[in-house]
Amino acid sequence: ITNKADLYRVLEEAGPVSALINAAAYTDVERAESERDLAFAVNADAAGWAAAWASEQHIPFVHYSTDFVFPDGNHDCWLEGDATSPLNTYGESKRAGELAVRIACPESVIIRTSWVYSEQPGNFVHKVLQLAQSAPSLTMVSDQVGRPTFAPDLAHAALRIAQDAALRLSIQGGLLHFSSGRALSRADFARAIIDIGVTEGVLNHAVPVVDTTSDQFVTAARRPLHCVLDISQAEALGVQLGRWEDSLAISVRAARQ
């Protein structure tokens, strides 16, 4: 995907394409600080090329972005039109991708999302369950606040947008914030995961979660603290499909298999 010719060849070989949804991304927030060129190659350059190809084919293009394009929040929620100011390389590369996509395909729709999890391993839900199986307690930050997003909900939203021209035109500025419900802290999300883990039989007993602050952890990348996306536009357009409280059990049950 970091080679334009190869990317175009793969897209051409895919046969007739009615829409293109770009879910490819470099998402390792920590490693991006030392792999800046690769992060920008995937999140910015490749995104722009994919958008340009879609524009050339005259087909809809939907692109995923992130809440990390914003800094620490100083109000309740970030609106789509609020000024961006990323705090780390990952966020900078995703913001550059937004700009590249918009230039290459002005009719594109960019979906910003946050805290994505699914049934697949490697996300926050499964990491919490793994730690809770062996640790007497977990220490989690309580000053990082956001909205969890169930990956299938996000995929359904993107597919619907790609298929519905009227809906795309209704999205203001081609920017949409999407997640699966209410905001909470990382610590509280971990507690919810553990509670459901016990209910679903993935965990034998509940493990206490101890609150801490982000400054107690040494990390290469700085994370925004209160970074909550305003999803009122998605709700008004009827794009929202569900709540993370309802879908979290699906992800937790998958860890049992």
Stretches found by the model and what they are:
Residues 34, 41, 45-49, 69-111, ...:
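Catalytic helix-loop patch of NAD(P)-dependent Rossmann-fold dehydrogenases
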Residues 20-24, 61-66, 71, 111-113:
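SDR active-site strand-loop-helix element
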Residues 99-160:
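NAD(P)-dependent short-chain dehydrogenase/reductase
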Residues 242-257:
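Amphipathic terminal alpha-helices
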Residues 157, 164-219:
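Mid/C-terminal beta-alpha module of Rossmann-like enzyme folds, strongest
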Residues 11, 158-162, 193, 231, ...:
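Hydrophobic "lid"/C-terminal helical patch
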Residues 1-42:
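NAD(P)H-binding glycine-rich loop region in Rossmannoid oxidoreductase-like domains
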Residues 8, 34-62:
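NAD(P)-cofactor binding segment of oxidoreductase domains
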